Regions:
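Non-heme di-metal
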Residues: 1-207
Length: 207
């Protein structure tokens, strides 16, 4: 699929909105998949958290669909990758791995890059799309926080060091790199200490 580009031209902004909409659509499926696949073995509050996440992601997708319509496009108008869903398939039998890879790596990456996208859209004069992306960014902090909280719950339940276990799972299940710069304030707000991910990024860069 085409790479996401900076939001300069109308075509680039449409492509970027489409790419984010695709991520949000996958995130809807992932939120409900984690409930259906793992909810029975977890406390009821786990299901409550991910139902709320799924509701948020559906609203995000709807908002992005409206913005795509406003720029004479629609979801499905462009090719899309399956990387996020591939991660779901790879972690389909391991809840800890699912939490480590999807919310704590992939969604946390959104916290790193979305503020720049907001600035790009504002700079291009598309304040409506910028506001949608800002809303998504602010609400995604809670989604990363839910993943981090439940990962730490599993670590405590299994008497494991959460930081070490997270790094082991990322090395095993994640095929990409943890790219700097990190949005450390947003990640910290989501309950992710720098010691979880920054040494891991350096290790992956060295491979």
């Amino acid at each position: 699929m085409p790479k996401r580009r900076k939001g300069g031209t109308d075509a680039n902004r449409r492509a970027l909105l489409h790419a984010v909409a695709h991520i949000e659509l996958n995130a809807i499926d992932l939120a409900f998949d984690i409930v259906a696949r793992f909810g029975a073995q977890m406390p009821r509050s786990f299901t409550d958290d991910w139902i709320q996440v799924g509701d948020d992601e559906a609203r995000h997708f709807t908002m992005l669909g409206s913005r795509l319509k406003a720029v004479d496009s629609f979801y499905g108008d462009l090719p899309a990758h399956d990387g996020l869903w591939q991660s779901a398939q790879d972690t389909s039998a391991d809840l800890a791995a699912r939490l480590a890879i999807v919310p704590m790596v992939l969604e946390a990456r959104g916290l790193d890059v979305t503020p720049r996208m907001v600035d790009q859209f504002r700079g291009a004069g598309d304040s409506a799309s910028a506001e949608v992306l800002q809303t998504i960014y602010e609400e995604e902090v809670a989604h990363v926080a839910a993943g981090t909280r439940w990962f730490k719950y599993l670590a405590k339940k299994q008497s494991r060091d959460a930081e070490v276990w997270f790094q082991e799972l990322v090395r095993e299940y994640f095929n990409g790199q943890l790219r700097k710069p990190f949005n450390k304030p947003a990640r910290s707000k989501a309950g992710m200490p720098v010691s979880f991910y920054e040494p891991l990024a350096e290790m992956l860069e060295g491979n």
